[in-house]
Amino acid sequence: MDLPGPIHDFLLVFLGSGLLFGSIGVVLFTNPIFSAFSLGFVLVCISLLYILSNSHFVAAAQLLIYVGAITVLIIFAVMFMNDSEYSTDLNRWTVGDGITSLICTTILFSLISTILDTSWYGVIWTTRLNQILEQDLISNSQQIGIHLSTDFFLPFELISIILLVALIGAISVARQ
């Protein structure tokens, strides 16, 4: 969006703080319904940040897929859970939980180090080369594919990692 500097900075800080408080709410709420609504708020803040950075396609996909479908599905699934089953096991910490936490922390730090060590200048050169190719393409789906693999590569990968974690969590909850 073409906003004046102070308004853009205010919206960035406002959405960032909303994202931070919403994500803290996802983790700290003991009621799963409140946690799911807080997740929906986080996903809306992320899509508004995409709009603020002129990534309208990714913002629309974020709103339609994650806020519109995934969050509603999570709330629907949480409403059918047996509440007494989860309230009695809150204070248990098993060896498997510790191993899982260690593995997830290791994966998180390896992802952070990979992102920090990646030379993003090569991605800029790839984008400039693909702009020449983009003019010759006829199909919109090919243009979307090029944009997802160049301009929106990092958000696309982060969203896919979030989906993978949600899928693994849903499978582990379903197996119990």
UniProtKB/Swiss-Prot annotation:
Report the GO molecular function annotations. Answer: NADH dehydrogenase (ubiquinone) activity; quinone binding
This protein's record includes keyword Plastid: yes
Reactions it catalyzes = a plastoquinone + NADH + (n+1) H(+)(in) = a plastoquinol + NAD(+) + n H(+)(out); a plastoquinone + NADPH + (n+1) H(+)(in) = a plastoquinol + NADP(+) + n H(+)(out)
Transmembrane residues, as ranges? 10-30, 32-52, 61-81, 95-115, 152-172
Predominant subcellular localization, coarse grouping: plastid
Which keywords has UniProt assigned to this entry?
Chloroplast, Membrane, NAD, NADP, Plastid, Plastoquinone, Quinone, Thylakoid, Translocase, Transmembrane, Transmembrane helix, Transport
EC number(s) on file: 7.1.1.-
> What class does this enzyme belong to in the EC scheme?
translocase
Membrane topology according to the record: Multi-pass membrane protein
One cellular component GO annotation, for this chain's record? Answer: chloroplast thylakoid membrane
User: Which InterPro entries does the protein's record reference?
Assistant: NAD(P)H-Q_Oxidoreduct_6, NADH_UbQ/plastoQ_OxRdtase_su6, Nuo/plastoQ_OxRdtase_6_NuoJ
Q: Which Pfam families would you find in this protein's record?
A: Oxidored_q3
Reading the lineage from the top rank, the first entry is Eukaryota
Q: Which Gene3D superfamilies match?
A: NADH-ubiquinone/plastoquinone oxidoreductase chain 6, subunit NuoJ
Compartment(s) of residence: Plastid, Chloroplast thylakoid membrane
Q: What does this protein do?
A: NDH shuttles electrons from NAD(P)H:plastoquinone, via FMN and iron-sulfur (Fe-S) centers, to quinones in the photosynthetic chain and possibly in a chloroplast respiratory chain. The immediate electron acceptor for the enzyme in this species is believed to be plastoquinone. Couples the redox reaction to proton translocation, and thus conserves the redox energy in a proton gradient.
Q: Which family does it belong to?
A: Belongs to the complex I subunit 6 family.
Description of how the protein assembles with itself and partners: NDH is composed of at least 16 different subunits, 5 of which are encoded in the nucleus.
Q: What is this protein called?
A: NAD(P)H-quinone oxidoreductase subunit 6, chloroplastic
For this protein's source organism, the top of the classification is: Eukaryota, Viridiplantae, Streptophyta, Embryophyta, Tracheophyta
Instruction: Give the encoding gene's name.
Output: ndhG
